[in-house]
UniProtKB/Swiss-Prot annotation:
The gene is lacZ. Mg(2+) 1 binds at residues 411, 413, 456. One of its GO terms (cellular component) is beta-galactosidase complex. This is Beta-galactosidase. The record marks 352, 386 as: Transition state stabilizer. Its EC number is 3.2.1.23. GO terms for molecular function: beta-galactosidase activity; carbohydrate binding; magnesium ion binding. It comes from Leuconostoc mesenteroides subsp. mesenteroides (strain ATCC 8293 / DSM 20343 / BCRC 11652 / CCM 1803 / JCM 6124 / NCDO 523 / NBRC 100496 / NCIMB 8023 / NCTC 12954 / NRRL B-1118 / 37Y). It catalyses: Hydrolysis of terminal non-reducing beta-D-galactose residues in beta-D-galactosides.
Length: 1036
C-alpha cells in the first residue's frame, strides 16, 4: 500500500507534464438510467454533499500518515461544497486582481503550501455493488489540485479546479462502510493558469457525487443540430461512443419528441460512421433525425425538444439517456454574428460563480434568481468569466433562455510578459486539456453560442493550437479571445475589453481603438463584441447610453458584456459580532487589491445597484417614437418590438399624460407585436395649461412568462411635451410688508422678520444660522463645496501597487483640492424696500501653495415672505484639475424622515447616468435616497430638480434646475470611512445643493473616464435657488 509520503514525493502539482492520474475522460452529462436501475435502485447517484471530516495542515510535510486510513482526533466537521477559508480558522481568503498571491516561479509553488484533508464515510449495500456495474466518484469543482484515496487505497490525482474529475473506484469499494478521503492542495502549477480577478480560496466547492454506471455504456453522447439556409429543415445528429464490452450486437436508438409527441425514431448499429480512408470506428455510431419546420431555440423563445437515446442489444437496455435539444444555427455571416439568420445584439454581463456566504458555491435557487433578474433587466447573454461553470447553470440557461460564452479556465495575467506561459510548448498539454475538456462536457448545450480560449493570457502559439482544435471539433460555433489585442488570428470576433466609443487608447503594444473606428479598419470585417465594458465598480456606469447609441447605429457593433454581475463581498463579522461585507485586505490578506472586488451591478446580497436600472433601460427591447402634425400637435405614437424572434402578445402598453406632476389621462392598450414590427397608436388628448406636461409610456408583462413575472416593467419612455420655464415670484402684496429688524454687529449680521432670524458671520462670510420660532434650522454654515467623497472611479486603482497619478483623486490630493483654505474678501449688505441683500466673495486657496483655485461670489436676498434666495457665481482659477461639483453644503436640523421632490427619479442619477430616470414628483425616505455602496462614497444624487421639500424646508429652483443629496452622513465621513457598517449617523441631515456635478464615469475604473461634456471645465458657473422654512404643510 503506497504511503502518502511516497505519493507526494512525485510533486505532481509542480510537474508540467502531469495534470492527472487515473482521471476518466470527460464527457457530456449522463443520468445512467436503465431498466435494471429502475428495478433495483431508484437513483444511480448518491450525493456526497453535506458534512465531511476536515483536518488542516499548513504545508504538505505536516500531513499525518494515519489520516490516509482514519480521521485524526483533531479533525472537525466542514460543509461541502464550500471553501475552507469560510468555515473556521483554517486560512484566510485572499483577494487580488493581477498579482499572484505567491512568488512567481512557474511551475513551482511555495513549500508552505496549505492542505485541506477531507474525508467522508459512505455506506453501500450489495445492490449498489451489483455485477456489470462500476462505481465512480465525481468531484465537480476542487481547487486547486487534489489526491484521492478510498478505504486507504490511493486512487488518483487531478488539477483544473473548474471542471469535473471522475474516478472509477469500483475495486476499492466494499459492502458496508467506505471512507473517501481527499487531500486538497491550495497551490499547484495550475494556479498559474487560474489568476482570475477574484477571491483566491480553496477546497471542495462544487457538488460531489457517487454514481453507479453500467460497464457497457456510452462513453460520450454528442448532439448537434443542423439547419438549411432557409431554416425550414433541420437534422438532429446523435453521435455516440461506446465504452465497455465489444460493440457486437449493440445498437443505439434515438427518438425525438416535441411537447410529448414522437416526431422521429432511428436505430443504428455501432461502426456505421466512416471516419477516414481506413473506414469506421467500431465503438462509434451516428444517427440522424430529420425535423420539418423546426421550432427554433433562442434566448427569447427557448424552444426545446426531448430526445431519448438508448443503448441496447435488442433484448436489454444497458443505458437510457434523456436529453434536451435546442435547434438553432450560429454563424458569422457578412461580418455579423447571427443566430437563425438574424444578427444578434448582445445584451451581456460577465458573471463569476460567487456567493457572499458560500464563496465559490452557488446553489440552484441562486442560479434561477440570477437568471430571472437578468431577464427582467433585459439581459440576454452571459460570459462565464473566466472558467466553465457548474453543469446545472447551462441546463437552466437552455431552459429559460440565455446566450452563453463558455470560457476556458486559463488566465496568466500576473506573469511578465503575459504570454510567457501561453507561448511555451511545455504548457500546451495543460492548456489544451482545459479547452478540450470544456468542449467535451458542454458541447450539447444550445445556450452556448461562443467558445472562449480564456482571459488575459497574452497571445501565444498555444492559443493557435487550441483555436484549431475547437474549429475542427466544433465548426458550429465561433471562438473569441481577447488576449494579444482582441483581434488576433485566434478569434473570430473582435473582443476587446474596455475599448471606448469614440476615444482611442494608444499603447506601445495592443492599442484599444475607439469601437466605431475599429470596425472600419482596413481588411477588418469581423463583428465587434466587447468581452468586458462598463466597469460597474461602486457608483459607476456613467456614459453607458453612449455605447448603446453606437450599438444601435452600427450593425457590426454587436453589444458587449458588462463587468460584472455581483459584488464579490464576503459576509463576515467583526470582533463586536457586527456583520459586514469584506473586501481585499479585510482578512489581513496580502497582496490585495482592496475594494476592486466590488464591481458588480448587484450588491453582495444580490439587491440591485442604481446602475442595473440604467442598463435595463438602455438595453430594453422596445422603442417609442412620437409623431406630430404640422401644427406641432402629437397625434400618434409608434411602439417598436426589437425582439428578433419573440411575438409580444402578453403585455400591455400603458401611457399617461401628466400636467404639473398630476395624471390627467391614462390609457391601456393590449399589444400584439410580431418580432421586428411596430404598432402605431392614436393619441387624442388636450391640455391648455401652461404647466409642465409629460407623457409616460410603459410596457408591462401581463402574466408570467418563463421566469419573467407578471407585472414586470419591460420597457418605458418619457416624452416632455411642454417644458415650463422655471419662475418663482413672491406671493404677498406690497401692502403687507413689515419692517426687517437688522442688527449689524462687529462679527455678525442678523436679520429678523416675524419669527425668523438669519445670522451671518462677518468674519467668515457664511450664513451661520437660521432660527425659526426659536429653533435652529441649520447646524453648520452654508458653505461652498467643490469636492465629493471619492468614487471608486475617482480613485482609479485596479492594483494597489500601481496607482495612476492621473486618477481624479490623486490629482485632487496633489493640489489640496479636498482641503481648500477659505478667504473672505468681501462682505456687504443693503436694505431695500422689498428685501435685504447680502453680498459676499470668497477665495479658495490650495493648502499646498496658497494658489487661488476658485472665487465664489454670492448674493443672498431675504424678502418679506421669509424666502431666502441665493445667487452664486463661481470662477475657476486653474485649468486642472476640474472640480467634482460646484455647489453648497449645510447640515440642517430635521425632525422627519419624509422627502418630496420634483425632478429626475426615482433612482439615484448623475449627469452622465440618468437615461433611466424620468421627471416626476417623488416621495422617499432618507434611507431610500441613500445608496449603500460597500465602500462608502458620494451617492444618492438626484438631478434636474425643480423643488425639494424636507421637514419644513422647501428649496425651489430659480433660473435653472439643481441637484441635491440628503444624507445622515457628511461627505467628510463618507471620505474617511472604509466600510458601510462603520458609518455613524450624524446629528441632523446633510444637504448638498449642486448647481453642477461632474459625471461618475465608468468606461473603466482605473483611468479617468468621464466624458468631456460631463466635466466642469468652464471658467464661470452660475446657479441659484430659493429656500424657505414654513411651519405646517409648505406649498410647493
Amino acid at each position: 500500500m503506497t504511503s502518502i509520503k511516497q505519493i507526494l514525493a512525485r510533486h505532481d502539482w509542480e510537474n508540467p507534464v502531469v495534470t492527472n492520474w487515473n482521471r476518466l475522460p470527460l464527457h457530456t452529462s449522463m443520468s445512467y438510467a436503465n431498466e435494471r436501475n429502475k428495478r433495483e435502485i431508484k437513483q444511480p447517484r448518491k450525493s456526497l454533499n453535506g458534512p465531511w471530516q476536515f483536518s488542516y495542515f499548513e504545508n504538505l510535510s505536516d500531513i499525518d500518515e494515519e489520516w490516509r486510513k482514519k480521521d485524526l482526533p483533531t479533525s472537525k466537521i466542514i460543509h461541502v461544497p464550500s471553501n475552507w477559508q469560510l468555515q473556521g480558522d483554517y486560512d484566510v481568503p485572499v483577494y487580488t486582481n493581477v498579482t499572484y498571491p505567491f512568488p512567481v516561479n512557474p511551475p513551482y509553488v511555495p513549500t508552505e503550501n496549505p492542505v485541506g484533508a477531507y474525508s467522508k464515510k459512505v455506506f453501500l449495500d450489495n445492490k449498489w455493488l451489483a455485477d456489470n456495474t462500476e462505481s465512480h466518484v465525481v468531484f465537480n469543482g476542487v481547487g486547486s489540485a487534489f489526491y484521492l484515496w478510498v478505504n486507504g487505497e490511493w486512487v488518483g490525482y487531478s488539477e483544473d479546479s473548474r471542471l469535473p474529475a471522475e474516478f472509477d473506484i469500483t475495486e476499492e469499494l466494499r459492502a458496508g462502510e467506505n471512507r473517501i478521503a481527499v487531500l486538497v492542495l491550495k497551490w499547484s502549477k495550475g494556479s498559474y493558469f487560474e489568476d482570475q480577478d477574484m477571491w483566491r480560496m480553496s477546497g471542495i466547492f462544487r457538488d460531489v457525487d457517487l454514481i453507479r454506471v453500467p460497464k457497457t455504456r456510452f462513453q460520450d453522447l454528442a448532439i448537434e443540430t443542423k439547419l438549411d439556409e432557409d431554416l425550414d429543415d433541420a437534422t438532429v445528429e446523435v453521435r455516440a461512443q461506446l465504452v465497455g464490452n465489444s460493440a457486437d450486437n449493440l445498437s443505439v436508438t434515438a427518438e425525438l419528441f416535441y411537447h410529448g409527441m414522437s416526431l422521429f425514431k432511428a436505430t443504428e448499429q455501432f461502426g456505421n460512421r466512416v471516419i477516414d480512408e481506413r473506414g469506421t470506428n467500431d465503438g462509434q455510431v451516428s444517427l440522424e433525425l430529420p425535423v420539418k419546420n423546426p421550432a427554433l431555440w433562442s434566448a427569447e423563445v427557448p424552444n426545446l425538444y426531448d430526445i431519448k437515446v438508448s443503448l441496447h442489444d435488442g433484448e436489454e437496455n444497458y443505458q437510457i439517456e434523456n436529453k434536451k435539444v435546442g435547434i438553432r444555427k450560429v454563424q458569422i455571416k457578412d461580418g455579423l454574428l447571427t443566430l437563425n439568420n438574424q444578427p444578434l445584439l448582445i445584451r451581456g454581463v460577465n458573471k463569476h460563480e460567487f456567493n457572499s456566504k458560500t464563496g465559490y458555491y452557488v446553489d440552484e435557487k441562486t442560479m434561477i434568481d440570477d437568471i430571472r433578474m437578468m431577464k427582467e433587466h433585459n439581459f440576454n447573454a452571459v460570459r462565464l468569466s473566466h472558467y466553465p461553470n457548474a453543469s446545472r447553470w447551462y441546463e437552466l440557461c437552455d431552459q429559460y433562455g440565455l446566450y452563453l460564452v463558455d470560457e476556458a479556465n486559463i488566465e496568466t495575467h500576473g506573469v511578465k510578459p503575459m504570454n510567457y506561459l501561453t507561448n511555451d510548448p511545455k504548457y500546451l498539454p495543460l492548456m489544451m486539456e482545459r479547452v478540450t475538456r470544456m468542449v467535451q462536457r458542454d458541447y450539447n448545450h444550445p445556450s452556448i453560442i461562443i467558445w472562449s480560449l480564456g482571459n488575459e493570457s497574452g497571445y501565444g502559439h498555444n492559443h493557435d493550437a487550441m483555436y484549431q482544435w475547437i474549429k475542427n471539433t466544433d465548426p458550429s460555433r465561433p471562438i473569441q479571445y481577447e488576449g494579444g489585442g482582441a483581434d488576433t488570428p485566434a478569434t473570430d470576433i473582435i473582443a476587446p475589453m474596455y475599448a471606448r466609443v469614440d476615444q482611442d487608447q494608444v499603447e506601445e503594444v495592443n492599442s484599444k481603438w475607439a469601437i466605431k473606428k475599429w470596425i472600419g479598419l482596413s481588411k477588418e470585417n469581423r463583428p465587434l463584441i466587447l468581452c468586458e465594458y462598463a466597469h460597474s465598480m461602486g457608483n459607476s456606469l456613467g456614459g453607458f447610453n453612449k455605447y448603446w447609441e453606437a450599438f444601435e447605429k452600427y450593425p457590426r457593433l454587436q453589444g458587449g458584456f458588462i463587468w460584472d454581475w455581483v459584488d464579490q463581498g464576503l459576509l463576515t463579522k467583526n470582533n463586536e459580532g457586527q456583520s459586514y461585507y469584506a473586501y481585499g485586505g479585510d482578512f489581513g490578506d496580502y497582496p490585495n487589491d482592496r475594494q476592486f472586488s466590488l464591481d458588480g451591478l448587484l450588491f453582495p446580497d444580490r439587491t440591485p445597484k442604481p446602475a442595473l436600472l440604467e442598463a435595463k433601460y438602455c438595453q430594453q427591447y422596445f422603442a417609442f417614437q412620437l409623431e406630430k402634425d404640422p401644427t406641432g400637435k402629437v397625434n400618434y405614437m409608434t411602439v417598436s418590438n426589437k425582439h428578433l424572434f419573440k411575438t409580444v402578445n402578453d403585455a400591455t402598453l400603458i401611457y399617461q399624460i401628466l400636467s404639473n406632476d398630476q395624471v390627467i389621462e391614462t390609457k391601456k392598450i393590449k399589444l400584439n407585436l410580431a418580432p421586428q414590427t411596430e404598432e402605431r397608436v392614436s393619441l387624442n388628448f388636450s391640455d391648455n395649461s401652461n404647466e409642465d406636461v409629460y407623457m409616460n409610456c410603459q410596457i408591462v408583462q401581463d402574466s408570467t412568462d418563463g421566469l419573467i413575472r407578471s407585472g414586470t416593467l419591460l420597457a418605458y419612455k418619457q416624452f416632455i411635451l411642454r417644458n415650463k420655464p422655471i419662475m418663482i415670484s413672491d406671493v404677498r402684496s406690497s401692502d403687507d410688508y413689515e419692517d426687517f429688524l437688522i442688527n449689524d454687529a462687529t462679527d455678525s449680521l442678523s436679520i429678523s422678520l416675524d419669527d425668523a432670524i438669519w445670522q451671518f458671520n462677518k468674519r467668515t462670510g457664511w450664513l451661520s444660522n437660521w432660527i425659526k420660532n426659536g429653533q435652529e434650522k441649520v447646524l453648520t454654515p452654508l458653505k461652498d463645496q467643490f469636492s465629493r467623497a471619492a468614487l471608486d472611479n475617482d480613485i482609479g486603482v485596479s492594483e494597489v501597487t500601481n496607482i495612476d497619478p492621473n486618477a481624479w483623486f490623486e490629482r485632487w490630493q496633489a493640489t489640496g483640492f479636498n482641503h481648500l483654505n477659505e478667504k473672505l474678501v468681501q462682505f456687504n449688505w443693503t436694505a431695500l424696500k422689498d428685501e435685504v441683500r447680502i453680498t459676499t466673495q470668497h477665495q479658495f486657496l490650495s493648502p499646498i501653495d496658497q494658489h487661488i483655485m476658485f472665487i465664489s461670489s454670492k448674493e443672498y436676498r431675504i424678502n418679506h415672505v421669509g424666502d431666502l434666495k441665493v445667487y452664486v457665481d463661481v470662477w475657476r482659477q486653474v485649468a486642472d484639475p476640474q472640480p467634482a461639483r460646484i455647489g453648497l453644503s449645510v447640515q440642517i436640523n430635521a425632525t422627519t424622515d419624509a422627502v418630496t421632490y420634483s425632478g429626475l427619479g426615482p433612482m439615484e442619477n448623475y449627469p452622465d447616468r440618468r437615461s433611466a430616470a424620468i421627471r416626476g414628483k417623488w416621495d422617499a425616505s432618507l434611507k431610500e435616497l441613500y445608496t449603500p455602496y460597500v465602500f462608502p462614497s458620494e451617492n444618492g444624487l438626484r438631478t434636474e430638480v425643480a423643488y425639494l421639500k424636507f421637514d419644513h424646508h422647501v428649496i425651489r429652483a430659480l433660473e435653472q434646475r439643481f441637484s441635491f443629496n440628503l444624507s445622515q452622513f457628511s461627505q467628510a465621513q463618507l471620505s474617511a470611512v472604509t466600510h458601510q457598517h462603520l458609518l455613524k449617523p450624524e446629528e441632523g441631515v446633510w444637504l448638498n445643493i449642486d448647481g453642477y456635478h461632474m459625471g461618475v464615469g465608468g468606461d473603466d475604473s482605473w483611468s479617468p473616464s468621464v466624458s468631456p461634456e460631463f466635466l466642469l471645465s468652464n471658467d464661470h458657473y452660475h446657479y441659484s435657488f430659493s429656500w424657505s422654512n414654513a411651519e405646517g404643510e409648505a406649498n410647493v
